From Swiss-Prot:
It is found in: Cytoplasm. GO terms for biological process: protein quality control for misfolded or incompletely synthesized proteins. Coiled coil: none annotated. One of its GO terms (molecular function) is ATPase binding. Its EC number is 3.4.21.92. The keyword Flavoprotein does not apply. This is ATP-dependent Clp protease proteolytic subunit. GO terms for cellular component: cytoplasm; endopeptidase Clp complex. Keywords: Cytoplasm, Hydrolase, Protease, Serine protease, Zymogen. Fourteen ClpP subunits assemble into 2 heptameric rings which stack back to back to give a disk-like structure with a central cavity, resembling the structure of eukaryotic proteasomes. Component of the ClpAP and ClpXP complexes. Cleaves peptides in various proteins in a process that requires ATP hydrolysis. Has a chymotrypsin-like activity. Plays a major role in the degradation of misfolded proteins. SUPFAM superfamilies: ClpP/crotonase (SSF52096).
Amino acid sequence: MSYSGERDNLAPHMALVPMVIEQTSRGERSFDIYSRLLKERVIFLTGQVEDHMANLIVAQMLFLEAENPEKDIYLYINSPGGVITAGMSIYDTMQFIKPDVSTICMGQAASMGAFLLTAGAKGKRFCLPNSRVMIHQPLGGYQGQATDIEIHAREILKVKGRMNELMAHHTGQSLEQIERDTERDRFLSAPEAVEYGLVDSILTHRN
């Protein structure tokens, strides 16, 4: 997780997105695959967590809540992490909206990706069998006058403390345990993530 106000140069998304054609009473309609899955209340959080991606995910959640506030939303996560403020906008929206947000880790959920994974609705947080989860403390970098560096250092420590409190709340671990375990990168397999309380169970097949 990066606290720095600077944004990384992000790799462009794939230029070609598969299209799905549906037959309706009015003829054929075509959707890009993500729009079609959004109709099924599926949202993808993939790649670096940054402002543009976070805004899109927040907008999709609010749209799905407006469509049906009673039905679950399914958030699929495959992310190495990213900018804390962007991730926290997604986190706060997940907690704010009425529908439960079920989180599913596919591939990896590292750093802010892991934080959002464990923020899903209790009992509805999942890993696929070979996915990996990594937790650690926030990363930060700032250049400037000594006084400004001191201000930013105090701020990142506040952010670290708040994120540890939230992680403890969602996992059931003690705050002291979270502080110890996030001092350095800690990688967990799917079974270890279940044992730690980051997720509730492992999905092997659809019901």
